[in-house]
Amino acid sequence: MVTETSFCQRNREFAPIQERGNTVSERETIEVDYLIVGAGAMGMAFADTLLTETDATVAIVDRYGRPGGHWTVAYPFVRLHQPSSFYGVNSRELGTDEVDQDGWNAGLHELASSDEILTYFDQVMRKTLLPSGRVSYFPMSHYDGADPARPDVQRCHSLVSGGEFDIRVRRRTVDATYMNVTVPAMCPPKYEVASGVRLITPNQLPALEQQASHYTVVGAGKTGIDACLWLLQHGVDPSGITWIMPRDSWLLDRAQIQPGPESAASDAESFTARIRAVLESRTVEELFQRLEAGGLLLRLSSDVTPTAYRCATVSRTELEQLRRITDIVRHGRVRRIGADTVELGGATVPARPGTLYIDCTADGLEARPVVPMFSGSRITLQTLVPCQQVFSAAFAAHVEATYEDDAEKNRICVAAPHPNTALDWLRSSAHLDDLLLRWFADRGLLEWCDASRLTKYSIGSLPDELRTALFEGLHAERKQLQQLLAHEDQTVAVAVAVAVAAN
């Protein structure tokens, strides 16, 4: 027997379904305008803006027991790499917008901790979304997909009781899990670990009861950086740390990503310097040299050219601390950690006795195919502004609320693949230029961006002459970036042809 409950009649939290043996005696169905799958940062940002700008009803189904997505399982010492001012949802501030007075982020705006972020998302759910009377929240529940016989009915079940329930969706199902964020605690390492080798995730570092004779951090992304900084902050001598770094990365300077009007002048200078660097460069190598000379990109070692770019952000002081670690292993990815050796893609190196290995190799934001964001009865949340996931989700909700035609929505909301290689800095920058140029044509979009707390890009409020100059600069930069990428592709093609001919 299936019963339907009107949205306004049901409780905000799903009541357990009574089961008899293996048969569900009553399968509940609710009806809403939107189903959002995932209560992580993107799902919450989308829901917040949608509720603010429409009268829609929403169901949120999430596999975790509290809002926050990957933050619920992240290592306890993780912090945002960029200011709290740009994170969360539009309707509620995160943090106090204070400037840190001490530590390795001193002089820069505060970075929320995982505890702060989890508390924040809980408050968003409990004090904003649920009190609206238009949100139904299903924690510890799994989304099973559409009912084959009824495409508008989405099937779900509780991960605790096993009880099944249906959600009839009048408008769209929103996939807020597509970006597939992972942290080390979510998955085992992709390399073999011999018996007796001590390997932990960063989550276990604060639970250490005795020091290790040596520490080896495996992985060089944001998590690897955090693990190295944590060890240094807790007094580990740099000589006691080995850092296995499959690729060096170009890093962003956090000082250049600061909120508030006091940063306006430096923002303008940075933007001008970036455009100048692009326009004056004739090769990709020259461009990165200019970007580094202008302080727009940073690297760990001056004698190693980075081949990766993944939006990792550091302060100059943090970078100085990381440079104290001199035992850096650059021989590709780990294949096997044995008792006496570590086998990597490019070499086998000796292992120090008593080493504690810290696995930081989870992909974070893996490369996902770009798909149309708006398609029939589905919305697939993806990054629009590179490396700004929550703004992208909130922006997508605004577009959904404001425009009627999917073709127009997809023209405005062109997703960007998450950057991976150094060349992706060029691709991401060209993508952002293209987006901003599209948005220039719609004053309403620019004004919405200006009002959003989730982005630095305040363009709509610029005087006409400055906006015109910016428009021209973006056009020129995009064209030059495309030419540099085409030149790089041609260079690679020639090198491959020469190699083939030589064989």
Segments from the language model and where they lie:
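Glycine-enriched catalytic-core subsegment of oxygenase/oxidase enzymes
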Residues: G68, L229, I328-H331, R335-A469
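Glycine-rich dinucleotide-binding loop and its adjacent helix/turn
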Residues: G107, S113, I117-Y120, R172-G235, ...
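N-terminal Rossmann-like FAD-binding beta1-loop-alpha1 element of flavoenzymes
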Residues: V32-A59, G224-L232
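C-terminal catalytic lobe of FAD-dependent flavoproteins
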Residues: G294-G295, R299-A367, L462-N503
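Extreme N-terminal leader/targeting segments of oxidoreductases
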Residues: E4-D33, T52-A56, N180-P206, A495, ...
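Glycine-rich active-site loop/strand segments that organize a redox cofactor
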Residues: R63-Y120, I244-S301
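Feature captures the FAD/FMN-dependent oxidoreductase FAD-binding
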Residues: Q101-V183, C311, E318-L344
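Short hydrophobic core segments
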Residues: V37, D166-V181, T216-V218, P353-D363
